[in-house]
Amino acid sequence: VTQQVVDLVALQKRTLRVLVVGQVVAAAALSAAVTVGAFVIQDILGQETPWGGISNATFTMGSAFMSQVLAQKMSRKGRRVGLQYGYSLAIIGGFIAGFAVNRSSLPLFILGLFFYGSGQASNLLSRYAAMDLAAPDQRSQAMSYILFGSTFGAVFGPVLIQPAQNFGIEVFGWSKYTGPWIASACFFSFALINVALRLRPDPLEVSGGLNSQQGVGVVTPKLGAALRTIKSIRNARVALASMVISQVTMVAVMTMTPVHLKLHGHE
């Protein structure tokens, strides 16, 4: 039993290292590309367009939708397969968005952003993967490591925007904002490889959580049923309202800040 405990502790430490590396890289990809999203909308629709926030809105909707898809896939196939699936879709979304930017195609750009949101969903779900093997009194600490790692990527990502722009323009002749999207897709490729090769064994499988709900006859509720349950519980309604208000505030600030800075010559 002691040896088993030691092995689990060692495996948890290794799992956290793998997830943190993925968080840093993926967070850099997300922050670099999403920062220029509003600029792309302005380039396509004009500087005075009232639709500058559509980029982050689409990205957020994609993240919300894919969170459901990836969570279900993880419950059946494990954390590694779910994260691989999410990062793969983010790579596809990044390349679609980059192609769309180069062609000034708004529909394609919106499509790419939606798929790109799966990268954010994967990063968020990584926090739960960090807790699979953690002791009950260490789960919050395990999640904090993932959050801490993502801050490095979030700070590092925007620094890459200018080099990516210059590289794309000088080497490939791309339009100004194409480079950051292609670079972000490449960063997600690294995150995908990191998870595919190093997140072994799967922490959810080791913890006994893989297919555990089906094994005891537990059925995941549909969205409508879940919303009705939330509606019937006061604290749940307050929690949901708080999350919605916080998300709206965050998206509004994130969208308009780069636009405001650009207008004042601080792009």
Model-predicted segments: where are they?
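Helix-loop junctions at membrane interfaces in 12-TM secondary transporters
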Residues: 13, 99-111
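C-terminal ends and interior cores of transmembrane alpha-helices
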Residues: 88-103
